[in-house]
Structures are given as C-alpha cells and as structure tokens.
UniProtKB/Swiss-Prot annotation:
EC number assigned by the record: 2.8.1.13
Name of this protein: tRNA-specific 2-thiouridylase MnmA
GO molecular function, one term: tRNA-uridine 2-sulfurtransferase activity
HAMAP family to which the protein is assigned, alphabetical: tRNA_thiouridyl_MnmA (MF_00144)
GO-annotated biological processes: tRNA wobble position uridine thiolation
Length: 369
C-alpha cells in the first residue's frame, strides 16, 4: 500500500490521528495490512486561548476518540503538546493577517509548520519509515520523482490545503485515502467496528467558533479593533467601521452602511485603516501576484511562462491561467477569465490537470485601484 523500501512487517509507520474517521481508518487499514503502527495526536490549543466548539480538529473529545481507537486497534498512542508552537505559528499569524487586512488560511499554515515539520521530525526521531495522514490527496511515485495529485474523490480533495508541502517532505509522507471515496472510508470504519465511523467531519478552522474569527482576534489582541473610515472606491466617505478585522474581501453583509445599491468590500488598506467598498463588478480581476512560491513541478523553480489551472479559494473551481516568473519567489498570475473576490492572504494553488504544481500566497496590491 505504501510502497516502502522495507518489508511491511519491518516497517514502523506513524499515523497522525486527529480523532476523526479518516485518520482512524488509515491506522486500522495499515494495522490490518501488517505494518507496525504508532498513533500520534497533537494537542494544539488551550480552550481558554481560542474559542472552543464541537466538531473541531484536535479538541478534547478528538484526543479521547483517537486514544480510544488506538486502544481498540492495540497500537501505541501518544499525545504531543504542540500548543505553544501552534499559537506561535498558526494563531498568532492568523491574528496578524487579519490586522494587516488579509484573509488568512490557517489550515495550510498548520500543515506547513506543525504537522509536516514538527510532527514529521518527531516521526523521524522515532526512526519511523513514514508519516501517514488521513488527507484526501494522492502521492504518486514516477520516474521523475514523487508527484502530488488531486484525490479520486473530487468532493473531498484536500490538495488545495497541501500546496506548501515540499518535495523533501513528500519523500516521507503518505496519503492512503487519496484513492478512496469518503463513503468507502466510512465503510471500512464500520467494517473495523470503529466507534467514530459516523462521526461528522471536522470544520475548517479548529479554533474559531461559528465562523466568528473576529471574536478570536479581539479576544487575543483587544487593541485590534480600531475605528476607521468606510470609503466608496469612487473616493467619498460613507461612514465609519469598528475595526478592519471585521471585514474580508468580497463581504456584503454586516458592512454597516445603508446605500442605494448593494455594497461589497473591495479592498482593505490596513496602513490607513480604511475599508473600501463598491459594486460587485469591482470584485472581479484577472491579474494578481503571489509570493513565497512552493514549486512541486519539474525542476527547482518556475523558470518560464506556463499555461496552468489555478484555484484562488478552496471552494472555487480551478480556472485556466498563465504564470509569469517575477522575482524572489514571486509569480504574476493572469487568468483567462476574471475571478471574483481574490483575497490577499489566501492561497493560489497551481494545477496541470490533477497534478499539483505547487502554489503561493496571494499578495496585497501596492496601491488602491
């Protein structure tokens, strides 16, 4: 199943167990297949630091569920305290991103900094042969190296959130569920008699309740709510806001302005503490920059213009575009057709069909258009 260089009965596999059905089923499949499996669960945050809610990844109930499954499978299980690291690398960056007028993507930063860095290094310290997760994405060995591909189940594909995985990390990571559908995963979970077989999927941001991200920001950084101006993109002042952390690009509701036509958040100027609003038509654009490119395609970096498909939000479909190398790991992206609400701080993930070529972070515009 994992195509390792050692025989499965001699291989030690660390499974990142979140307490959900996906990672629990992976652990069960590998145990049944004859591997020596070790379950690891990360404790990521204090409930008094973030906003607690049910259905959150790596919360108290999830740790209990992971340990219960490990006992059922009769595999070793450890809980690692990564709360400080998670706060430093994910929550603090999440807060700063909103303060800077961006729309952050903490799940990618968690994969990038905690799961595939700290946890991966811990697995290596255990002299494990691989770190395995329950992500829906495919890792394919080819003559040209290891490739990352979209999952077979397009509805559950998580490749967008894994674009920052490096080539060296892919040498050690494996994703057995990439060739399964979610229904197949639940079937196997029931077959193994796992008590979490019908457990709902975790939500996107584990430490935010009901999408109220501004409550987390305000709780951990109370001075982040500074009043400022709401300005129409044509230049005139419409009113006052109570903090740019309450806004994101493309937002229509809860702007707090009465106007003859629907208003949307078009841009956020963090330096001037101004929220720019305007008609929906102003949300569409074809050209933007991405920074901190992680390249998974041929060679070490994008070196010439390339026709690709890109996703600018996890919920968006991939659209055709052309990449132009710029400088310092920056790339200009020109879309074939305009896309709506391209938000700084979100990821732009690059594809060629099902192949993940990498991605980067959408950069803020230098000037107000």
């Amino acid at each position: 199943m994992l195509n390792l260089k050692v025989a499965k009965e001699q291989a030690t596999i660390v499974v990142a167990m979140s307490g959900g059905v996906d990672s629990s089923t992976v652990a069960a499949i590998l145990k049944e297949d004859g591997y020596n499996v070790i379950g690891i669960t990360m404790q990521l945050y204090n409930h008094d630091t973030a906003i607690n809610r049910k259905g959150a990844c790596c919360a108290g109930q999830d740790i209990y569920d992971a340990k219960f499954v490990a006992n059922q499978l009769q595999i070793p299980h450890y809980v690692l305290n990564y709360k400080d690291k998670f706060k430093e690398s994910v929550i603090d960056n999440f807060i700063e991103s909103y303060i800077n007028g961006e729309t952050p993507l903490p799940c990618v930063q968690c994969n990038q900094s905690v799961k595939f860095h700290d946890l991966l290094n811990f697995a290596k310290d255990l002299q494990a042969d691989a770190l395995v997760t329950g992500h829906y994405v495919r890792r394919i060995d080819t003559a040209n190296g290891i490739e990352l591909h979209k999952a077979v189940d397009s509805k559950k594909d998580q490749s967008y959130f894994l674009f920052a995985t490096t080539k060296s990390q892919l040498q050690y990571l494996h994703f057995p569920l990439g060739n399964m559908t979610k229904d197949e995963t639940r079937y196997h979970a029931n077959r193994y008699g796992l008590h979490i077989a019908d457990k709902p999927d975790s939500q996107d941001i584990c430490f935010v309740a009901d999408g109220a991200y501004h409550n987390v920001v305000a709780k951990l950084k109370p001075n982040a709510k500074k009043p400022g101006k709401i300005v129409h993109i044509d230049g005139y002042i419409l009113g006052e806001h109570q903090g740019i952390i309450n806004f994101t690009i493309g937002q229509r509701r809860r702007i707090g302005i009465s106007f003859s036509d629907p208003l949307y958040v078009i841009n956020i100027d963090a330096q001037q503490n101004i929220v720019y609003v305007g008609p929906e038509s102003k949300l569409f654009k074809t050209t933007f920059m991405i920074h901190s490119l992680n390249w998974l395609g041929p060679g070490n970096m994008l070196v010439e213009p390339l026709d690709v498909e890109v996703k600018v939000r996890s919920t968006h479909s991939a659209v055709r575009a052309k990449l132009y190398p710029y400088s310092n790991s920056m790339v200009k992206v020109i879309l074939n057709e305009p896309e709506k609400a391209i938000a700084p701080g979100q990821a732009c993930v690059i594809y060629k069909g099902d192949l993940v070529l990498g991605g980067g972070w959408i950069a803020k515009e230098q000037t107000q258009s």
